[in-house]
């Protein structure tokens, strides 16, 4: 009876169910009726319902579309509808409707969407309350885990699983081949479920949900539901958003379905296989541009390709090769996919067992494509290609065969023809690329190639890596240190060792702490550890060497090199190079303070020196000819500061006796007999380092030997016959030994004071004696000796006296340095005599023993040394410095001796530290040495002033900054590199606004322009002449390029806002000044300033990185943070456009009129500049130039002409390349360094190419016509017969009208000149 009542209510509800409130009862009654087991009632129901099927479908569809109760009513209606279709004896095709099926799918989507907390309230609140208890029962697990409640915020997970399970069952007998829209909607809905279900992952068994979705999608991949290929294509399209999303379960589901289900079905279905092979290509087209999502897309593509068959993989590789020639977004995807393909797919270099492996290799094509993309116009693509090529090199360097093929592919094999040297040239360009990311990637590639090549690299690449160690960016410097250290780690050739030592140790002075630490680490590993290993293996090696008494010097050198492995001799020799030793000292000091120096290093160095001596003696060579390996004593002197207990006194005492007894003059006489050269400078250097070592370990020496050594040193000092380098070492060692000899510090000071004053007194007597001798000889009128031998002896005596006086003066300075409080009152007069000799206006003429000759000419060494010693005395005595500073400045300015000027620069910069306020007025005179004719003086001045500026002893003000600019274009490459590092790294951090504040002034100064009323110099012509030294005057190409190089360097230091401000300042202070008459454009320097301004405004460095229509990709910062970057780009573009319209364009219009009125040649430069400025605003030129229609027309014409010329040039290149290819000529490996990718340029290039081909054909016809061949008779030519106007043939004579038409045919003119 209840079933009868339900049946009646359902039928009544269908007939009058137009109200949405009746749908709930209808759905509930229908579900209750379908749950009954009475077949008779159900058959009656089906019969009654069939007569009103349309009304029923309308009502049930409306219920499934209902948003009531947050979609719960709709999902209950869907459950009831599916239960109806699944019930026994149900007339399925009567009750199945595409519209109702679409409503069912919509109800599933809406039920899974995010719910609002307030949903279901209002008019339905009572119904919610009434059903709460009913829905809130603890329903157990059909669809979720651990028996948790089946709902959360109104979501019933169990109900959802029931609906999906019934949907899958319905699809087994309801075929959708007749309903393509329903099939499409089903695929889309099921593909969306993994994403929509994320909000309910807490109450859903997500894995089971994915399994059910996979079953539904797999079920429709059946011929019963239509064409499988079309269905698979629709599924692939619908799963694409999941495949392209980040790491998530939904993405894993999509990848699993495609790589397993689709791939398994495609094996036996050619049409389905075609769909599957096209899916990765479709994903490539849909891949996003931002870096991280693009990476996920690449991973998805690779997973699908890996699951494909070999044929499909090969087809996709060919597709990737074509992508490399496409648009920028495809090219960047291609370079990201290639390394993954090579590392994931099998046999990239062909079958190892096949003899024709190279022919079957698809990997070589990929490598070649990567190499080509390393020269792409997009910096992002260049950087990605270089870094990915580095990954490929690392992956393929595993076995010997792969290494050999890879070397051949990259052009490193002598046997390869094409591409030889291409990668080397490529690396040289990319390591100095304008984009930092490209330089970093290039250095990474160099590091990987170093391992491949075993460190044997072209010298230019090594120098490029060394130069990169001075890059302005920290990351580039780190990469460069890593790259060149890897080369040195693998290869110990002399060229690699030398370049490493000249590039890496200097990084100990870097501002970045991490780079300093890396420098210490690699020095410890590659220098000290290598020396330590060499010391450990010496004994067995030396024992194995043959003992040959008839040994030449070359054989001995060879034996010594064989004695020390890993190029240790070259390493030690370069360590004591004057350009390397200061950094080695700094590194050893830093390692020593951190207690990282191992005692075994000192023992190894002693072992190296001992074994070298033993080998020398074993060849029966005279011991007085022996010298230790170059650099060994130097490094021992540096490490012994912190390893004094590891150095043996017997060892030092033995070698001191050897070096001290060497008589250079006597040895020179025996040199020819022994066939070995004698190098006295080597002994002097070794003695200095040995004395330094003795000083370092003096506190460990026994008392008696220390006293004996001190007496010996004092005697040698007082003889004044030492080399200047040895004097300092002797003096310092003697001071240290005095501390050892004395029991207290006061006693030690008294001992030092005693021998310092004793030595100074003797030195002053020697100097005075020489001066008096020179003066008396100048007054002597004795007839010169006629005998040559007597004259020679006399000259030799004078030379020895001069040498002794020079050493004496130098010794005084050394003594003053170690004991500043020494009494110098008796020494100053004699030094004053020397440095003022020849001056008739000397103030002390009657008080001091003046030299009657000019010692500057008679004894230049003594003259120079006296200035140096006086400088040391001034450092110890401020009052003395105050008296003599004017003399130092005067001599620095007037001296014609480069060595003296160099020493004076050193002295003056030392004064800057000790007497900062006193020396400030002399800074301009010091900076003049930046333009000194001697390179050494210029470099020394630059380095010393740079250090003072970094330590704030000198300020960047006045002319100092402007004079430093000239070092950027110095003739010396070393100075240019130092200047680039100063401006690009140090100054950019220390004074970031300096380039901006001084930019306009720099333009006037560099052009030596005084034609501006605001920049004119009121001083005399003499000051202008002085300023000319620091200018680059002239309008020639060389001068302009030098100035432009300086401007570009300054622009690179500016922030974007400063570039905008600089643009405005140039327009206001130069262009506007010229149009207002403040800048005289008839003056040559004024014209140069104006032309420079035009060039600067048109250069790319002053333009901001985000321009109109430009893509968002850059190399340094990829597309991350796209919204912020886009907003910033719009703001910058708006600011530039506003500035152009309001400020720049009116100035240009006024200035153009002025230049035209004066017939100035600068009009062309102005037009070129304006064309470059407005090329990004082609569509707005009419609006911008509304005030000057003529200028508007001229600019449009110039732009069109420029673009046409550019297109014609590219077309000519393309035609030439095509011709050479047809003629069998090999194409360039890198094709083109500049692949222009402009939106409108491609069509113009195609059009121009067609014109070029047609013109070429026309020229060939003209050449044949002009070749002298006579025109054949008309009867011999194959031509159609002509009839007269009357229809009668005129006996072989052509009609007059036809001849006239031929006369009027168009003439082809040769345009070879175009």
From Swiss-Prot:
Just give the chief location class. nucleus
GO BP terms: namely: cell division; centromere clustering; chromatin organization; chromosome condensation; meiotic chromosome condensation; microsporogenesis; mitotic cell cycle; mitotic chromosome condensation
The entry's localization annotation reads: Nucleus; Chromosome
**Residue stretches of each HEAT repeat:** 20-58, 98-136, 184-222, 231-267, 269-310, 331-360, 361-398, 417-455, 457-493, 494-532, 821-859, 878-916, 917-954, 956-992, 1053-1091, 1138-1179
Record key words, sorted = Cell cycle, Cell division, Chromosome, DNA condensation, Meiosis, Mitosis, Nucleus, Repeat
- What highest taxon heads this organism's lineage? Eukaryota
What Pfam families does the database record attribute to this sequence? Cnd1
Q: In this entry, which stretches build a coiled coil? A: none
Q: Residue ranges for motif Nuclear localization signal?
A: 789-796
Where does it sit, as one GO cellular component term?
condensin complex
Q: Does the keyword Cell division apply?
A: yes
Regarding tissue, the record states: Present in buds.
UniProt induction comment: Regulated in a cell cycle-dependent manner with an increase during G2 phase, highest levels in the middle of G2 and a drop during mitosis. Induced by MMD1.
What outcome is recorded for mutants in which this gene has been deleted? Dwarf plants with small rosette leaves. Reduced pollen fertility and seed set. Lower chromatin density and frequent (peri)centromere association in interphase nuclei as well as impaired sister chromatid cohesion. Altered interphase chromatin architecture in differentiated nuclei. Defect chromosome condensation in male meiocytes and in centromeres orientation. During meiosis, extensive interchromosome connections at metaphase I as well as a slight reduction in crossover formation.
For whether the record's keyword set contains Cell division, the answer is yes
Using the UniProt annotation, give all residue ranges assigned to the region (Disordered): 116-150, 1210-1237, 1265-1314
* Residue ranges with Basic residues bias: 130-140
Q: What does this protein do?
A: Regulatory subunit of the condensin-2 complex, a complex which establishes mitotic chromosome architecture and is involved in physical rigidity of the chromatid axis. May promote the resolution of double-strand DNA catenanes (intertwines) between sister chromatids. Required for plant vigor, fertility, chromatin condensation and sister chromatid cohesion both during mitosis and meiosis. Necessary to maintain normal structural integrity of the meiotic chromosomes during the two nuclear divisions of gametogenesis, especially to prevent interchromosome connections at metaphase I.
- Subunit text: Component of the condensin-2 complex.
The name this protein goes by in its record: Condensin-2 complex subunit CAP-D3
Species per Swiss-Prot/TrEMBL record? Arabidopsis thaliana (Mouse-ear cress)
């Amino acid at each position: 009876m209840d079933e009868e009542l339900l049946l009646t209510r359902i039928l009544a509800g269908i007939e009058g169910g137009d109200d949405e409130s009746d749908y709930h009862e209808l759905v509930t009654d229908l579900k209750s009726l379908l749950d009954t087991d009475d077949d008779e009632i159900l058959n009656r129901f089906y019969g009654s319902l069939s007569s009103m099927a349309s009304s029923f479908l309308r009502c049930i569809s409306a219920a499934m579309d209902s948003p009531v109760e947050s979609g719960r009513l709709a999902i209950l209606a869907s459950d009831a509808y599916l239960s109806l279709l699944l019930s026994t004896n149900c007339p399925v095709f009567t009750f199945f409707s595409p519209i109702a099926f679409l409503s069912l799918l919509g109800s599933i989507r809406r039920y899974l969407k995010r719910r609002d907390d307030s949903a279901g309230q209002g008019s339905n609140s009572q119904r919610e309350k009434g059903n709460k208890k009913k829905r809130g029962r603890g329903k157990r697990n059909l669809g979720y885990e651990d028996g948790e409640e089946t709902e959360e915020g109104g979501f019933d997970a169990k109900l959802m699983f029931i609906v999906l399970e019934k949907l899958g069952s319905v699809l087994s007998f309801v075929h959708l081949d007749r309903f393509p829209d329903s099939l499409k909607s089903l695929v889309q809905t099921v593909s969306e479920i993994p994403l929509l279900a994320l909000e309910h992952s807490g109450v859903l068994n997500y894995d089971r949900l994915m399994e059910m979705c996979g079953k539904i999608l797999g079920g429709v991949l059946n011929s019963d539901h239509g064409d499988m290929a079309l269905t698979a294509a629709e599924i692939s399209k619908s799963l694409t958003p999941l495949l392209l999303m980040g790491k998530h379960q939904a993405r894993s589901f999509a990848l699993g379905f495609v790589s397993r289900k689709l791939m398994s079905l495609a094996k036996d279905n050619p049409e389905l296989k075609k769909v599957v092979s096209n899916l990765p290509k479709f994903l490539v087209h849909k891949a996003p541009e931002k870096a991280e999502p693009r990476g996920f897309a690449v991973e998805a593509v690779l997973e699908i390709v890996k699951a494909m068959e070999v044929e499909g993989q090969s087809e996709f590789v060919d597709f990737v090769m074509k992508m490399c020639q496409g648009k920028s977004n495809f090219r960047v995807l291609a370079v990201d996919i290639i390394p993954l393909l090579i590392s994931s797919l099998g046999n990239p270099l062909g079958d190892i067992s096949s003899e024709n492996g190279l022919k079957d290799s698809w990997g070589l094509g990929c490598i070649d494509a990567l190499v080509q993309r390393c020269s792409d116009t997009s910096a992002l693509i260049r950087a990605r290609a270089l870094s990915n090529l580095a990954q490929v090199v690392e992956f393929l360097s595993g076995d010997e065969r792969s290494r050999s093929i890879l070397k051949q592919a990259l052009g490193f094999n002598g046997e390869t023809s094409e591409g030889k040297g291409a990668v080397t040239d490529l690396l040289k360009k990319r390591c100095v690329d304008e984009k930092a990311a490209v330089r970093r990637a290039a250095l990474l590639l160099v590091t990987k190639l170093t391992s491949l090549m075993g460190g044997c690299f072209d010298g230019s690449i090594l120098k490029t890596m060394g130069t990169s160690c001075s890059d302005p960016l920290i990351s580039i410097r780190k990469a460069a240190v890593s790259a060149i250290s890897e080369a040195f780690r693998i290869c110990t050739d002399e060229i690699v060792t030398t370049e490493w030592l000249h590039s890496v140790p200097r990084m100990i002075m870097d501002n970045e702490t991490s780079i300093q630490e890396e420098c210490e680490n690699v020095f410890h590993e590659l220098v000290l550890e290598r020396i330590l290993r060499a010391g450990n293996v010496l004994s067995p090696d030396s024992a194995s060497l043959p003992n040959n008494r008839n040994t030449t010097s070359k054989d001995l050198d060879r034996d010594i090199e064989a004695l020390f492995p890993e190029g240790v001799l070259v390493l030690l020799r370069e360590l004591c190079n004057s350009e390397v030793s200061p950094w080695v000292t700094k590194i050893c000091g830093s390692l020593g303070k951190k207690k990282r120096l191992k005692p075994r290093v000192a023992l190894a160095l002693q072992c190296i020196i001992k074994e070298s001596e033993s080998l020398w003696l074993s060849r029966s060579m005279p011991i007085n000819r022996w010298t230790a390996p170059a650099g060994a004593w130097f490094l021992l002197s540096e490490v012994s500061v912190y390893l004094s207990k590891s150095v043996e006194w017997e060892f030092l005492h033995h070698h001191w006796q050897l070096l001290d007894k060497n008589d250079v003059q006597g040895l020179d006489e025996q040199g020819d007999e022994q066939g070995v050269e004698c190098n006295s400078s080597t002994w002097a250097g070794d003695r200095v380092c040995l004395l330094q070592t003795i000083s370092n370990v003096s506190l460990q020496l026994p008392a008696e030997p220390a006293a004996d050594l001190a007496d010996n040193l004092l005697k040698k000092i007082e003889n004044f016959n030492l080399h200047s380098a040895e004097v300092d070492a002797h003096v310092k060692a003697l001071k240290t030994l005095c501390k050892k000899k004395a029991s207290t510090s006061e006693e030690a000071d008294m001992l030092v004071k005693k021998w310092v004053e004793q030595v100074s007194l003797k030195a002053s007597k020697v100097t005075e004696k020489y001066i008096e001798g020179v003066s008396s000889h100048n007054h002597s009128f004795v007839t010169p000796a006629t005998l040559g031998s007597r004259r020679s002896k006399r000259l030799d005596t004078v030379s020895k006296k001069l040498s002794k006086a020079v050493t004496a003066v130098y010794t005084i300075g050394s003594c003053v340095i170690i004991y500043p409080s020494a009494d110098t009152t008796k020494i100053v007069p004699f030094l004053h005599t020397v440095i003022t000799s020849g001056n008739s206006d000397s103030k002390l003429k009657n008080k001091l023993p003046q030299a009657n000759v000019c010692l500057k000419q008679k004894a230049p060494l003594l003259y120079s040394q006296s200035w140096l010693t006086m400088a040391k005395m001034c450092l110890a005595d401020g009052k003395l410095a105050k008296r003599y500073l004017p003399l130092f400045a005067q001599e620095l300015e007037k001296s014609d001796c480069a060595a003296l000027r160099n020493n004076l620069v050193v002295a003056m910069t030392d004064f800057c530290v000790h007497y900062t306020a006193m020396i400030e007025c002399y800074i301009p005179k010091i900076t003049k040495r930046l333009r000194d004719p001697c390179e050494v003086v210029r470099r020394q001045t630059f380095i010393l002033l740079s250090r003072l500026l970094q330590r704030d002893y000198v300020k960047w003000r006045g002319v100092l900054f402007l004079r430093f600019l000239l070092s950027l274009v110095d003739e010396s490459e070393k100075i240019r590199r130092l200047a680039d590092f100063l401006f690009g790294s140090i100054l950019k951090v220390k004074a970031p606004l300096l380039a901006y504040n001084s930019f306009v002034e720099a333009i006037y100064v560099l052009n030596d322009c005084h034609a501006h009323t605001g920049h004119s110099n009121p001083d005399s012509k003499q000051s202008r002449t002085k300023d000319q030294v620091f200018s680059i005057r002239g309008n020639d190409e060389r001068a302009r390029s030098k100035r432009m190089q300086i401007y570009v360097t300054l622009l690179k230091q500016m922030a974007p806002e400063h570039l905008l401000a600089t643009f405005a300042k140039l327009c206001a202070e130069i262009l506007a000044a010229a149009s207002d008459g403040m800048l005289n454009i008839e003056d040559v320097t004024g014209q140069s300033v104006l032309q420079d301004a035009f060039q600067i405004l048109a250069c790319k460095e002053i333009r901001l990185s985000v321009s109109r229509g430009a893509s968002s990709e850059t190399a340094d910062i990829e597309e991350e943070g796209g919204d912020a970057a886009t907003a910033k780009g719009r703001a910058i573009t708006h600011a530039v456009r506003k500035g152009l319209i309001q400020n720049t364009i009116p100035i240009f219009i006024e200035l153009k009129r002025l230049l035209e009125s004066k017939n100035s040649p600068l009009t062309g430069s102005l037009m070129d500049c304006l064309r470059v400025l407005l090329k990004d605003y082609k569509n707005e030129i009419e609006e911008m130039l509304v005030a000057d229609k003529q200028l508007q027309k001229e600019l449009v014409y110039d732009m069109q002409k420029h673009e046409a010329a550019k297109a014609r040039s590219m077309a000519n290149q393309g035609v030439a390349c095509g011709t050479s290819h047809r003629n069998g000529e090999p194409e360039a490996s890198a094709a083109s360094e500049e692949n222009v990718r402009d939106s409108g340029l491609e069509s113009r290039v195609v059009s121009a190419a067609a014109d070029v081909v047609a013109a070429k054909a026309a020229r060939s016809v003209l050449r044949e016509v002009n070749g002298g061949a006579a025109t054949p008779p008309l009867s011999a030519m194959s031509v159609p017969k002509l009839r007269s106007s009357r229809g009668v043939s005129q006996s072989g004579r052509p009609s007059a009208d036809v001849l006239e038409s031929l006369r009027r045919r168009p003439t082809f003119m040769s345009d070879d000149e175009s």
